[in-house]
Amino acid sequence: MSPVASTRWCPTPEQLMILEEMYRSGIRTPNAVQIQQITAHLAFYGRIEGKNVFYWFQNHKARDRQKLRKKLAKQLHQQQHQLQLQLQQIKPKPISSMISQPVNKNIIDHHNPYHHHHHNHHHNHHRPYDHMSFDCCSHPSPMCLPHQGTGVGEAPSKVMNEYYCTKSGAEEILMQKSITGPNSSYGRDWMMMMDMGPRPSYPSSSSSPISCCNMMMSSPKIPLKTLELFPISSINSKQDSTKL
């Protein structure tokens, strides 16, 4: 019994070189006519059938797809690795270190107008009279020093002493103005400044009024005295007369 001949195709080097050249030229899936022509041409270099040509092109396309898939996977892996390196370089600081750092209030006030406004409003809320500290020094307005008191024998007409400090030439004039009327709501006793003492001299070139506050701050301290406009003895005599 003769041995069965092997049906496995063993291409020769010339056949493989011709097939690879055809594949590089652009032939990927040859039709039936092309397969017959290629088989007839390769039969000069060895045994070959039409199915061998068909399967060679199919296997060669599969190998190329596998190589392309591996190449794309490798490129994707490299891109992910580079992205991780970039993220590590720009990694933000931990939250604990940011909390431990002191906050500069001046920077916050400069960059946040709302915080600046709120801070000023809060500051003015606790000190509402700071803006009135030097009003008398900035304007030549009258200055009153009342001392309200309550007691028996309060006069029906109230007296308000207003002091004006003006300047005419090189001399200063202290004027006192008395205002009476039912609309005034002051008490019976008033704090008055006595013995004003020597007042400082100013150059005669300026003709604008100078406030009392500036003059008082530049002059030595002046003692204050309380005058009894309504002595107690007169009040007692009035009470005795009413009893009679």
UniProtKB/Swiss-Prot annotation:
Compartments, as annotated in UniProt: Nucleus
SMART domains: HOX
N-terminal signal peptide: none
Sorted UniProt keywords: Developmental protein, Differentiation, DNA-binding, Flowering, Homeobox, Nucleus, Transcription, Transcription regulation
GO biological process: adaxial/abaxial axis specification; cell differentiation; centrolateral axis specification; flower development; plant organ development; regulation of epidermal cell division; stipule development
Gene Ontology MF: a single term: DNA binding
GO cellular component, one term: nucleus
Transcription regulation found in the keyword field: yes
DNA-binding region location: 4-68
Keyword check for tRNA-binding: no
Regions crossing the membrane: none
Gene3D superfamilies registered for this protein in UniProt: Homeodomain-like
Free-text tissue specificity from the UniProt record: Expressed in aerial parts of seedlings, inflorescences and flowers at low level. Expressed in a restricted number of L1 cells at the lateral regions of flower primordia.
Pfam families from the UniProt entry: Homeodomain
InterPro entries from the UniProt entry: HD (IPR001356), Homeodomain-like_sf (IPR009057), WUSCHEL-like (IPR044555)
UniProt-listed CDD domains: homeodomain
Function: Probable transcription factor required to initiate organ founder cells in a lateral domain of shoot meristems. Involved in the lateral sepal axis-dependent development of flowers, probably by regulating the proliferation of L1 cells at the lateral region of flower primordia. Required for the formation of the margin cells of the first and second whorl organs.
Recorded family membership: Belongs to the WUS homeobox family.
Protein name listed in UniProt: WUSCHEL-related homeobox 3
UniProt source species: Arabidopsis thaliana
Gene label: WOX3
